[in-house]
Design a protein with these regions (language model features):
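Conserved C-terminal region and hinge/linker of Rieske [2Fe-2S] proteins, especially
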Residues: 1-157
Length: 157
């Protein structure tokens, strides 16, 4: 029986292989640009703008999203295995998770586990999830997290 994979990671299709290499190369380039937390973020983004020509706003979104991915070890490990998420999907994940504020480690771990399961292929040549689908799934997970938090905080006065 054939292993599950996303259509965007199909190793038998030459176009898909090239697109995979582009995603992987771009991802690895930006991962290597993520600054240390004590770095001057504005200087880093300005320098990257000058050297890459990428809009500073996009650079900020990319770096913040990759920093967030470090907080999701299961999803990050899957990404390092499949390179199935392009930067726009990773940015969408970060933007959605920003709604959580400062969640507990348990909430982050639960979202990491469930999001990773959602973004793991379950059948051969499965269509890759769209940004909209990923956002909807994250909204469900965030709403569940909010309900859990509301249930543990007690009534408001």
């Amino acid at each position: 029986m054939e292993e599950p994979y996303f259509s965007t990671t199909n190793t038998t299709d030459p176009t898909t292989r090239l697109a995979f290499e582009m995603r992987k190369t771009e991802y690895e380039f930006w991962v290597n640009q993520v600054p240390e937390l004590d770095s001057d973020f504005e200087l880093v983004t300005q320098s990257l703008y000058r050297t890459t020509g990428v809009n500073e706003g996009r650079i900020v979104h990319i770096l913040m999203a990759l920093h967030r991915l470090e907080e999701l070890p299961e999803l990050q490990a899957l990404q390092h295995r499949l390179y199935h998420l392009d930067l726009d999907r990773i940015i969408a994940i970060n933007k959605s998770l920003n709604r959580l504020g400062n969640p507990t480690p348990e909430v982050v771990a639960r979202i990491d586990e469930q999001l990773t399961a959602y973004l793991t292929p379950t059948r051969p040549n499965q269509t890759m999830r769209t940004q909209a689908q990923i956002k909807r799934k994250l909204n469900e997970l965030i709403n569940l997290a909010d309900d859990t938090l509301a249930g543990t905080q007690g009534p408001t006065q």
